[in-house]
């Protein structure tokens, strides 16, 4: 009898140990601090996913594991299950993803919502292209519109850009400042504070929420509201890891993604408003463009769209079709 009891107890312990070791983890790398709105949004995703499944979500923020530029390779290779990267990080192999960074193309929240909605004509092209890298888009994280940061002089005219070295975070954004006579410097988000502090660049661009989360008002004193591009981040997951999950687990990820995507998109206007207030409260001058200044910047940078179309297949190519789809939104 004692032997039977021992066997039963051993079996229970083995089953318990197996369950522990079989625990499914989803590690997510993020370049921003957890307190930033993208980090807070990942907490929404974590809560919703863990509520619906046995997947345990672990978030590694502040580029602890990978910098933004390293995320596509890390996730695509399976070095980590998932990660958040700015959309432009996939432009090396898929230049069409830079559609959102074309100057002044998405000039209203309505257009941005339509373009980034799951299943939109634009995402029907972008998501499969990104997935070829082995990193599958789960959902887009709104980061807001791109603004310009500088010291002393606002960046409100083409002349203000001339001969300045400017921090950018993508090739197409680099083409934008080049078209205005500036010199682009590709610097990751986690390194921009030091670049401004050390004077490595004369000016820079970012999403206004980054001014708050990274305390950029400590090193730059002027914010020009150009809204020249729509900054999108994307949570991607490794394709092989996704395929290894059960149908129930994948369904839970899809449901959690939908909730988190809607949450960050709906709160974007409030996030930006709070960021502008904090920037102003900390001494930053907020400069808004006049209609004449906006027109001048738009006209001076129009060649960027033509160059994008040429780089993505020319007339009738994928980029041309995306630009036309964007103009119809």
Predicted segments — roles?
Residues 1-8:
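Bacterial N-terminal signal peptides that target proteins for export
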Residues 15-22:
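Sec/Tat signal peptide C-region and signal peptidase I cleavage site
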Residues 23-112, 121-123, 128-329:
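N-terminal secretory/targeting leader peptides
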Residues 115-117:
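Ser/Thr/Gly-rich flexible loops in soluble cytosolic domains mediating phosphotransfer, phosphorylation
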């Amino acid at each position: 009898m004692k032997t039977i009891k021992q066997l039963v107890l051993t079996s229970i312990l083995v089953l318990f140990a197996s369950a522990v070791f079989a625990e499914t983890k989803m590690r997510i790398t993020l370049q921003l601090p957890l307190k930033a709105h993208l980090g807070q949004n990942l907490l929404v995703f974590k809560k919703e996913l863990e509520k619906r499944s046995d997947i345990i979500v672990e978030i590694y923020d502040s580029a602890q594991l990978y910098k933004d530029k390293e995320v596509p390779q890390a996730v695509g290779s399976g070095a980590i299950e998932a990660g958040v990267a700015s959309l432009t990080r996939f432009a090396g192999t898929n230049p069409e993803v830079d559609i959102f960074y074309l100057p002044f193309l998405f000039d209203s929240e309505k257009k941005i919502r339509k373009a980034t909605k799951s299943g939109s004509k634009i995402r029907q092209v972008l998501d499969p292209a990104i997935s070829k890298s082995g990193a599958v888009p789960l959902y887009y994280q709104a980061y807001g519109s791109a603004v310009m940061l500088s010291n002393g002089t606002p960046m409100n005219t083409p002349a203000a850009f001339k001969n300045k070295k400017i921090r950018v975070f993508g090739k197409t954004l680099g083409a934008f400042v080049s078209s205005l006579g500036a010199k682009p410097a590709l610097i990751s988000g986690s390194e921009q504070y030091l670049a401004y502090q050390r004077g490595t660049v004369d000016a820079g661009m970012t999403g206004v929420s980054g001014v708050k989360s990274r305390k950029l008002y400590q090193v730059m004193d002027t914010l020009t509201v150009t809204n020249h591009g729509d900054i999108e981040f994307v949570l991607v997951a490794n394709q092989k890891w996704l395929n290894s999950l059960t149908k129930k687990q994948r369904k839970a990820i899809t449901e959690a993604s939908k909730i988190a995507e809607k949450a960050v998109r709906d709160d974007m206007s409030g996030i930006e408003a709070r960021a502008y207030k904090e920037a102003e409260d900390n001494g930053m001058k907020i400069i808004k463009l006049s209609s004449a200044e906006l027109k001048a910047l738009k006209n001076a940078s129009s060649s960027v769209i033509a160059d994008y179309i040429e780089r993505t297949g020319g007339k009738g190519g994928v980029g041309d079709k995306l630009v036309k789809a964007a103009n119809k939104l």
